[in-house]
């Protein structure tokens, strides 16, 4: 995923929420995405762990 991609994010117990990627940071354990959400227009960070499906919080929107 890259900046300006439309995504959905997994949050605690609720439905996936739509957003837009504002920034991407690569790490050895995975990738951090700064995602603008309706409640957080300036963005909130989400981490996608590599190799662990439970650790995937950001996905491309369909």
Curated annotation (Swiss-Prot):
Belongs to the DsrB family. The gene is dsrB. The lineage of its organism: Bacteria, Pseudomonadati, Pseudomonadota, Gammaproteobacteria, Enterobacterales. InterPro entries: Dextransucrase_DSRB. It comes from Enterobacter sp. (strain 638). This is Protein DsrB.
């Amino acid at each position: 995923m890259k900046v300006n991609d439309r995504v959905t994010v997994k949050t605690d117990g609720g439905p996936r929420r739509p957003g837009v990627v504002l920034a991407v940071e690569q790490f050895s354990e995975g990738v951090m995405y700064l995602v603008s959400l309706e409640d957080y227009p300036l963005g909130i960070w989400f981490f996608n762990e590599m190799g662990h499906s439970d650790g995937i919080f950001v996905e491309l929107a369909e």
